[in-house]
Regions:
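Membrane-embedded alpha-helical bundles of multi-pass transporters/translocases
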Residues: 1-221
């Protein structure tokens, strides 16, 4: 989104940028809604895919299915927040876009403290997505990028955006296939294996989150 939006801003001005962003958001929201709804509807099948080792432990499996259903709409809110970040970065407003992801920990920790239940963690993840969208809204309103979404798959600039997204989607797809296989394997290893893997992954991702994402966002055109 950022390169195409920046190009429109540079070549045609702010109004053209706003018009493109409204269409990009409209198309993206359609995709995000479809993915989120399918995830909720097929949560049981997805849980069997990536946590098949829990099937024989009925209470744990049912809790995992419930948590999957609760968390899947996070994709919608996270995608919406990512679009907001793109607009803010393109308009050189980096502070809010950089701060919003920090709410991830706030949502999870806050929910866990307020509600002592495993489901609280899933609710916290969902709350994080909502908070990220809300946190960006004032900044987006200040720059005038709160126009209602427009669905237009035929717009040439939207098509350019989708063409740019496809290679990245393929690359991320490889990563997530590996993640699903790892989760499936870990579900067979007994209590705590999933948590150990998550903590190790977060430790590995820490430098990327602090340095790589910040630098890459600032160097985008």
């Amino acid at each position: 989104v950022v390169p195409v939006l920046s190009k429109r801003l540079a070549e045609e001005g702010d109004e053209a940028g706003k018009s493109f962003f409204a269409r990009a958001r409209g198309v993206s929201l359609v995709v995000l809604v479809i993915v989120s709804v399918l995830g909720v509807l097929f949560a049981r099948q997805l849980t069997e895919l990536w946590a098949g080792g829990y099937v024989d432990d009925v209470p744990k499996f049912e809790m995992t299915v419930t948590m999957t259903r609760v968390m899947f709409p996070y994709i919608f809110f996270m995608g919406t927040a990512a679009l907001g970040m793109a607009a803010l970065n393109a308009k050189k407003h980096f502070a809010v876009a950089a701060f919003a992801p920090a709410l991830f920990s706030v949502g999870i920790v806050g929910a866990a403290i307020a509600w002592r239940d495993p489901l609280a963690l899933a609710v916290g993840v969902l709350a994080d997505g909502v908070m990220q969208v809300i946190a960006q809204f004032p900044a987006l309103k200040r720059i005038g990028y709160t126009e209602l979404p427009k669905i237009d798959f035929k717009d040439p600039h939207v098509r350019e955006m989708l063409k740019r997204i496809l290679p990245m989607t393929f690359g991320l797809g490889v990563y997530y296939v590996d993640l699903v296989l790892s989760r499936r394997f870990l579900s067979e290893l007994g209590e705590g294996a999933q948590s150990w893997f998550s903590w190790a992954s977060r430790l590995c991702d820490l430098p990327q989150g602090i340095f790589v994402m910040a630098i890459s966002s600032a160097t985008l055109p």
